[in-house]
Amino acid sequence: MSQPSARPSAVIVLAAGQGTRMKSTTPKIMHAIGGRSLVGHALAAAWSLAPEHLVAVVRHERARVAEHIETVAAQLGIDALAIADQDDVPGTGRAVELGLAALPADLEGTVVVTYGDVPLLTPETLARLVADHEADGNAVTVLTATLEDATGYGRIVRDAEGLVERIMEHKDALAHAESTGDDSFVAIREVNSGIYAFDAALLRRTLPAISTDNVQGEKYLTDVLGMARDEGGRVASVGTQDVWEVEGANDRRQLSDLGRRLNERVLRHWMKEGVTVVDPSSTWVDVTVTLSSDVTLKPGTQLHGATSVATGAVVGPDSTLTDTQVGERAVVKRTDATEAVIGADASIGPFTYLRPGTVLGEEGRIGAFYETKKVTIGRGAKLSHLGYAGDAEIGEYTNIGCGNITANYDGVNKHRTVIGAHVRTGSNTVFTAPVTVGDGAYTGAGAVVREDVPAGALALNAVSQRTLEGWVPAKRPGTSSAEAARAAGAEGSGAQG
């Protein structure tokens, strides 16, 4: 076996299927697992080969699918993409023929054909397919897998030299066994994945000649293998030990199975890199997430999108982070965060909701039952419990009391609250934006801050407490409160109020 270093001239990704068994208004290849659509995974694997050209063949919901593919290609840095349209002639042979037509007419070298609904195919396997194909001078190289149950798959039939003689479809193997009593073809467990490396010149010669004179009325790509052998070309194979690499998603159950397998692969990778995953069965990490060594993921953790978690951080239990950055040694528990930045040594949760634009500085804290949005919180600042901070800036080492909120919305526009450094706010303070509180200022419990507070000042609302002694026994006689008050020596005065 050769080293996987060859670069193909082109990769053709077949993405024209409708996917009716998904029973969805979303095209099959746009369904997602592990943070990417099915076709996104296929394009990423294809582009890992660094081909000169990459073609996606589309048909069903053409405009929507093509736009999605172009968006994914831009995200992956693919700069050699072409979109080809499949016409009314059905079959994989026709799809590849139209994909080939989108490539330069004088293209030489290796053309890889793969599928847009096979998300677990690895770059390493594709590279090995190309390398062996070119090193051995094959006309066609088939990617195969060996299954416990090969029902429904085309069987790999080999000649005396061990090369691929032909691919026998399952129904043909059954028919042969029924008519001859020979079930040797049915017993074959090595199957065709539908993924190939071809010589480009061979495809140009043979694809136009493929007939639709068959039961399905389709142009079968597998016919190229027989044509190659008729020309004296070598048809060989490369096998994968992981059968999940060649599994497609045709319905929701298969989509779920593939998602679970992909997640297991992702978690195994990160555990090898020094990440502790306490319970892999309840932990989900997208392929786009970045983790550092000595990160700990506790049960119920979900990490999505461009989330990154730095060394020594602990996430979970029961936390969902999307496009969120977590700093070194930070602790995030029972938190839902989207597009947030959590500084080193910071603490979040439990039961915390960080909305887009939340930036928590180093050593900061956002505690239980807090919601934040578009807020920058300085180093060492604390928002410990029961509050809302939105459209705000909070300075370093400020302590925000229990039940504080920034009243940022006047019914039409959002307004900003600025709270300085080393501020101390009393419980249930309301900041009616726009308002600024200077460094070192205090607010009293229950204060409604409607005007700017200078540095070092105390802001409180001057409402004196009024106490009506004996009110409960007089006004709520017969209640348990009245009985308790009388037992404590209170007398009902009949005071008004």
UniProtKB/Swiss-Prot annotation:
Listed Low complexity bias regions: 480-490
Stretches the record annotates as Linker: 253-273
Family annotation (Gene3D superfamilies): Hexapeptide repeat proteins, Spore Coat Polysaccharide Biosynthesis Protein SpsA, Chain A
Cofactor note: Binds 1 Mg(2+) ion per subunit.
Intracellular or extracellular location(s): Cytoplasm
Primary subcellular site in the record, as a coarse category: cytoplasm
Protein keywords: Acyltransferase, Cell shape, Cell wall biogenesis/degradation, Cytoplasm, Magnesium, Metal-binding, Multifunctional enzyme, Nucleotidyltransferase, Peptidoglycan synthesis, Repeat, Transferase
Residues binding Mg(2+): D117, N250
Location of region: N-acetyltransferase: 274-497
Region of interest (Disordered), residue spans: 473-497
Catalytic activity from the UniProt record: alpha-D-glucosamine 1-phosphate + acetyl-CoA = N-acetyl-alpha-D-glucosamine 1-phosphate + CoA + H(+); N-acetyl-alpha-D-glucosamine 1-phosphate + UTP + H(+) = UDP-N-acetyl-alpha-D-glucosamine + diphosphate
GO cellular component entries: cytoplasm; membrane
Pathway: Nucleotide-sugar biosynthesis; UDP-N-acetyl-alpha-D-glucosamine biosynthesis; N-acetyl-alpha-D-glucosamine 1-phosphate from alpha-D-glucosamine 6-phosphate (route II): step 2/2; Nucleotide-sugar biosynthesis; UDP-N-acetyl-alpha-D-glucosamine biosynthesis; UDP-N-acetyl-alpha-D-glucosamine from N-acetyl-alpha-D-glucosamine 1-phosphate: step 1/1; Bacterial outer membrane biogenesis; LPS lipid A biosynthesis
Binding positions for acetyl-CoA per the UniProt entry: N408, Y409, S427, A445
Repeat is among the record's keywords: yes
Cofactor(s) in the UniProt record: Mg(2+)
Listed EC numbers: 2.7.7.23, 2.3.1.157
SUPFAM superfamilies associated with the record: Nucleotide-diphospho-sugar transferases, Trimeric LpxA-like enzymes
Pfam hit, one: NTP_transf_3
GO terms classed as biological process: cell morphogenesis; cell wall organization; lipid A biosynthetic process; peptidoglycan biosynthetic process; regulation of cell shape; UDP-N-acetylglucosamine biosynthetic process
Active site: H385 (proton acceptor)
GO molecular function, one term: glucosamine-1-phosphate N-acetyltransferase activity
Family: In the N-terminal section; belongs to the N-acetylglucosamine-1-phosphate uridyltransferase family.
Job description of the protein: Catalyzes the last two sequential reactions in the de novo biosynthetic pathway for UDP-N-acetylglucosamine (UDP-GlcNAc). The C-terminal domain catalyzes the transfer of acetyl group from acetyl coenzyme A to glucosamine-1-phosphate (GlcN-1-P) to produce N-acetylglucosamine-1-phosphate (GlcNAc-1-P), which is converted into UDP-GlcNAc by the transfer of uridine 5-monophosphate (from uridine 5-triphosphate), a reaction catalyzed by the N-terminal domain.
Binding partners and assembly: Homotrimer.
Protein name: Bifunctional protein GlmU
Species, as recorded: Micrococcus luteus (strain ATCC 4698 / DSM 20030 / JCM 1464 / CCM 169 / CCUG 5858 / IAM 1056 / NBRC 3333 / NCIMB 9278 / NCTC 2665 / VKM Ac-2230) (Micrococcus lysodeikticus)
Gene from which the chain derives: glmU
